[in-house]
Curated annotation (Swiss-Prot):
Organism annotation: Drosophila grimshawi
Feature: compositional bias, Low complexity: 126-149, 156-173
Gene3D superfamilies: Classic Zinc Finger
Localization of this protein: Nucleus
GO MF annotation list: DNA binding; zinc ion binding
Name used for this protein in its record: AT-rich binding protein
Purpose: May be a transcription factor for genes having (A+T) stretches in their promoter and/or enhancer regions. Binds to AT rich DNA.
Record flagged with keyword GTP-binding: no
Source organism phylogeny: Eukaryota, Metazoa, Ecdysozoa, Arthropoda, Hexapoda
Keywords: DNA-binding, Metal-binding, Nucleus, Repeat, Transcription, Transcription regulation, Zinc, Zinc-finger
Gene coding for it: ATbp
């Protein structure tokens, strides 16, 4: 809501006669001429008509609306004419009172010049802005044209470069074809010269002298060729060693079984260690068979093959014992509860305490403590069948399957992978 303005009876707005003053819910009008406060607009109009001789509507009847360069200029002219008549009447001795309408506002020549100067300045600024915009547009067009020319020039250079490369490739192909033709011509001439009275060796030597072919091998091909040559030489030697006749070759010694391998282990070995020993014994069996096959070949020409088999068994038994001792569970890394881990509390209840280092966690059941001891070992029995991850406990595997693979299964599915 805008500030209220003073309206006349013919709906004109006067802003130079009075001013509205607001205070809470009440308002009053202050006269600009005498600074008197009036409570209503009717009282304000009556005041300016009575006190300041303002005749409302006189200016509208006396001057034309089209020629209004300055506001109420006709009122001022009529007031000056009436004033001259009043002075003439006063000279005659009769004093008369003439109501002169008060001019609201009049533009002076200075103000008119200022307005004209402001208008000219505004027009000049507008023209200057238009010129600047035109200049900027021209600069942008020039830059765009320069960019297009530069791109066209680069495109032409690229085409020329490609054309030159194609010409060079074609020239190289022509040179290679020319060289091949010359080589064929030389070979044909040499064949014709040697065919009249020479043998095949002279013919081949003349062809070899005319054409020099170089075959270069990469380092990988050289290594592969050397390996193939070594393999062929080893195979030849192997077959030569088997040429020696053998009347009755001795059978290979029986491989050590899982029971023999487990005999080297201590009595406290767990099921996981036994499973590992079975795998190791199988590997040792394969190694023993290969070693027996290798050692029996050069010794077939000698006597006493049974003694050699016994020596092989003795040699293979020592590494197997060492492997079994390494795989035997240690005291600090055992997953089995020892007898000293059972502790009785004050109330007579029996507890199983983990004696690994400074752990000291108590369990009510021995099986729970054995499951807990897996945490301290390096063995990861639970393997994920979706990836290569392995875990010490089944709970960790189930959590991994839920989070990584979004799989949910029962506990019977999460079995330790022993083999």
């Amino acid at each position: 809501m805008g500030f209220p303005r003073i309206l006349s009876k013919n709906h004109k707005i006067y802003t130079k006669l009075g001013e509205f003053c607001l205070s809470g819910d009440s308002f009053w009008i202050v006269c600009h001429t005498c600074q008197e406060e009036l409570q209503t607009q009717d009282a304000f109009w009556k005041h300016i008509q009575d006190e300041h001789n303002f005749l409302h509507g006189v200016a509208k009847q006396e001057h034309n609306r089209s020629s209004s360069s300055s506001y109420c200029l006709a009122d001022v002219e009529s007031a000056s004419a009436v004033t001259s008549n009043t002075t003439s009447v006063q000279t005659a001795g009769n004093v008369t009172t003439v109501a002169v309408p008060v001019a609201l506002y009049k533009y002076t020549e200075d103000e008119q010049r200022d307005v004209a100067a402001a208008v000219e300045l505004h027009e000049a600024q507008h023209q200057q802005q238009q010129q600047q915009q035109q200049h900027q547009q021209q600069q942008q067009q020039q830059q765009h044209q320069q960019q297009q020319q530069h791109q066209h020039h680069q495109h032409q250079q690229q085409q020329q470069h490609l054309h030159q490369q194609q010409q060079q490739q074609q020239q190289q192909q022509r040179d290679a074809a020319k060289e091949l033709a010359e080589l064929h011509a030389v070979a044909a001439a040499a064949a014709a010269a040697g065919g009249g009275g020479g043998d095949s060796s002279a013919h081949s030597s003349s062809i070899g002298g005319g054409i020099d072919i170089k075959v270069e091998l990469t380092p990988e091909m050289q290594v592969a060729a050397a390996a193939a040559a070594a393999a062929s030489s080893n195979t030849t030697i192997y077959h030569l060693s088997q040429v020696v006749p053998v009347s009755a070759p001795a059978p290979p010694p029986p491989p050590p079984t899982a029971a023999a391998a487990s005999s080297f282990l201590s009595g406290g070995a767990g099921s996981a260690t036994a499973a590992t020993i079975v795998g190791v014994s199988t590997t040792a069996t394969t190694t023993a068979a290969a070693a027996a096959a290798v050692t029996t070949v050069p010794q077939q020409s000698q006597l006493g093959s049974g003694n050699n088999a016994g020596a092989v068994m003795q040699q293979l038994g020592l590494p197997l014992i060492a492997v079994a001792q390494e795989l035997a569970p240690k005291d600090s890394n055992s997953t089995t509860a020892s007898a000293s881990s059972a502790v009785s509390s004050d109330d007579g209840e029996r507890w199983y305490v983990c004696d690994y280092g400074t752990c000291g966690i108590k369990f009510k059941y021995k099986s729970r403590m054995e499951l807990h001891r897996v945490v301290h070992s390096k063995e990861r029995r639970f393997n994920c069948d979706m990836c290569s991850a392995s875990f010490k406990q089944s709970c960790n595997l189930s959590t991994h399957r839920k989070k990584k693979h979004s799989l949910r299964g029962i506990k019977s599915d999460l079995l330790p992978q022993r083999f």
